[in-house]
Amino acid sequence: MEQQPLTLTAATTRAQELRKQLNQYSHEYYVKDQPSVEDYVYDRLYKELVDIETEFPDLITPDSPTQRVGGKVLSGFEKAPHDIPMYSLNDGFSKEDIFAFDERVRKAIGKPVAYCCELKIDGLAISLRYENGVFVRGATRGDGTVGENITENLRTVRSVPMRLTEPISVEVRGECYMPKQSFVALNEEREENGQDIFANPRNAAAGSLRQLDTKIVAKRNLNTFLYTVADFGPMKAKTQFEALEELSAIGFRTNPERQLCQSIDEVWAYIEEYHEKRSTLPYEIDGIVIKVNEFALQDELGFTVKAPRWAIAYKFPPEEAETVVEDIEWTIGRTGVVTPTAVMAPVRVAGTTVSRASLHNADFIQMKDIRLNDHVIIYKAGDIIPEVAQVLVEKRAADSQPYEMPTHCPICHSELVHLDEEVALRCINPKCPAQIKEGLNHFVSRNAMNIDGLGPRVLAQMYDKGLVKDVADLYFLTEEQLMTLDKIKEKSANNIYTAIQGSKENSVERLIFGLGIRHVGAKAAKILAEHFGDLPTLSRATAEEIVALDSIGETIADSVVTYFENEEVHELMAELEKAQVNLTYKGLRTEQLAEVESPFKDKTVVLTGKLAQYTREEAKEKIENLGGKVTGSVSKKTDIVVAGEDAGSKLTKAESLGVTVWNEQEMVDALDASHF
């Protein structure tokens, strides 16, 4: 029976229902980290809302989840005055500073006080304004009196609620930051693309929020912690600790690592604890914020011209060390970017021994004037990546000479060039052995074709011996050829051959990612595969068709089209097809959702222990292709735990929660019985 078109009244009602439902699911996923539905359930409802808003554009509201994805290109940022100033905090750098702060507070109040201690997130200070519970404005701190209006960019940050659980009008303050893992991935991508890298996660967050293209912001995986209210009039809390609880209750993401301390000794113990834990956190912190807990006492203490008297920010000492640059090595990535690395005298920084640091590109070396045998200060950016922070010029030898940049590829000796005003040097020889080897490494990697046994050493041997010249050649190798490689005996050769042949059955998104198309990551590859269905169809797609997809911008679209315009790519596709490598998407496409029959459909599954018949990745992929979701931890939301050999604490927790437990064979039987 043909579905009747919606009336305006019906569309209005349904859009309201969908917005409420989707905002709740988003809050559970991004703020509480407790998703209650599978991704594709959310996606299906989201698509329904998009369709309604497309047909009835007047129904689009500021709190609609469709307004998060970005797509607007802004001409600039308007000024955003703060009715209530965003004060900075006085800093403390030692135990003496913190104890002196406590002494001043107790002297002014006349009694001991309790303190609320919170982690000082190293991001960008933001202010969020809500009217009747709906997000209407987001701004940067600026000078504390006037910031910049970044509302459209903050709409793309998933942990910023579009609508609160209470219809109150309130302005809250907090920090927008970039998680460490996202920071590393972003810099790797920028380095590979010849762009300037960010010095640290704070700069990355700030730079992202000041992007004029909101679609770029949406891809940056920013997050937030909210920690105070500009005016507590609409709030019930009487203390800072209660305020954080209340902020969480009405929909904001707050940091759970806070602690209420009854004395300054407890405060110092908290500081020492998180100074040790700092490197284990998934986000960057640069200190601890200490606030008098009771608002009545805060009011009594008041403010100076610049800062509150009732709070102080303890700043951690920098994790840095001095060493000597002994050499600068250059390596070539799969897209031809030539990256310099400083080889240094080993030194301890942030608990680890460091002897190498990325110098990113030639401009970085020239900007800092880094030379061989220079004494330098290094630190860990985001507690992760060793960076050269400073050159100690006063210790430089009198006969020191500026570092001479390479002009030719260290591997194939082709001339190095700058493309399109990139900061990176590139080798543009498509036959460069280093690029081909890196491309082979990428092709067999875990998120690509996932071929076990083919590490960089083995692949380099294959190339050097003339066994492979491109990725398609892998599929024509024989076991006898594999046994000609160093340290590859009959059993290893058989294992590698079996792994290569098995990868032919992968769903095509792995192949798309493995081909190394510039700017196309694993997520974009899956979006492309799901929409176009197979590689030949994708190869014929126009930039307009590609850019119309959610989360796919012009850069990716142009890159994909350019890639498939190359005749050598079509020859490679023909060879892959000849080798019977699967070129189609095996996952669940939107139009097939209703037809799926599987015990895994709509279920949350956890895999634990050793599996004999599949690798963990293979099992995960098969379950997700049938509409299930595989997560890494057991909770009340888990439907099935598959327990392999030597299953440990996850099995114990599943049993204690009464979650259904399957052995591996039950999982295999369920996979075999599934179809769509």
UniProtKB/Swiss-Prot annotation:
Transmembrane segments: none annotated. Keywords: DNA damage, DNA repair, DNA replication, Ligase, Magnesium, Manganese, Metal-binding, NAD, Zinc. One of its GO terms (molecular function) is metal ion binding. The active site is at K120 (n6-amp-lysine intermediate). Zn(2+) binds at C409, C412, C427, C432. This is DNA ligase. DNA ligase that catalyzes the formation of phosphodiester linkages between 5'-phosphoryl and 3'-hydroxyl groups in double-stranded DNA using NAD as a coenzyme and as the energy source for the reaction. It is essential for DNA replication and repair of damaged DNA. Its EC number is 6.5.1.2. It comes from Enterococcus faecalis (strain ATCC 700802 / V583). One of its GO terms (cellular component) is cytosol. Residues 595-676 form the BRCT domain. NAD(+) binds at D39, Y40, V41, Y42, D43, S88, L89, N90, D91, E118, R141, E175, K291, K315. Gene3D superfamilies: 5' to 3' exonuclease, C-terminal subdomain, 6.20.10.30, BRCT domain, DNA ligase/mRNA capping enzyme, Helix hairpin bin, Nucleic acid-binding proteins. It holds the Pfam family DNA_ligase_aden. Belongs to the NAD-dependent DNA ligase family. LigA subfamily. GO terms for biological process: DNA repair; DNA replication. Its cofactor is Mg(2+); Mn(2+). It catalyses: NAD(+) + (deoxyribonucleotide)n-3'-hydroxyl + 5'-phospho-(deoxyribonucleotide)m = (deoxyribonucleotide)n+m + AMP + beta-nicotinamide D-nucleotide.
